[in-house]
Amino acid sequence: MHKIAFSGIPGSGKTTVLAEVGKLLSLKYRVDEVPDLKPGSPFDYDQRAGFVSMFYFITSQINEENIRSQGRPDFLLCDGSLLDRWLEWRSAKAEKSGNGQAAERGALLESLYRFWMPSYTTVFRIRADAMVLKERGAKAGLQEFAPGHSRQTDELYGQTIQQDRIPAFDIWNHQSIDESAQVAMVHLADMKLI
């Protein structure tokens, strides 16, 4: 089984590109998908960056991936990954002043992240420039972030991928969904996975 994560900032097109890649792969392979876990979560948006919610999202992501892998698909496509959850935690931690337990909590989440990330065959980092994100966000009713937030988060993705040597490929999602999906398929072919 090859586990492929689609990661990136909100509004970048992860879910849409994943769906198209899933359609293409399913023509020849058994494919299962792990959906984005946030829409069905018990947390409001402003509560999502706390320790309890991050622990929930990280452990739920691991559990859902394990459950879906029991069906032994050839490809397991994940709408988001532990990379996304870990970076949400790091961003929130940078914005808040910590209490005495912050270091312990951070160490626990980091241990889960470091343990689980090698289970991904590769990560597709879906990217879009600020103007595209602003336009998509308005159309989709997504929360508008402070100026520079998307850029800072995108930079944090790049730094983390490089520092942790995560096998990742950037897909700039400015073109059609078909073209973005084809870029992903080319990378999978280059890796000799298809």
Which stretches of residues belong to each language-model region?
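Conserved substrate/cofactor phosphate-moiety recognition/catalytic segment
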Residues: G22-N66
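A glycine- and Lys/Arg-enriched "phosphate-lid" helix/loop adjacent to the NTP-binding pocket
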Residues: E88-Q162
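Hydrophobic positions on the alpha1 helix immediately C-terminal to the Walker A/P-loop
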Residues: V17
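The conserved Walker
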Residues: P10
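NTP-dependent small-molecule kinase module
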Residues: A138-I194
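Conserved lysine of the Walker
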Residues: K14
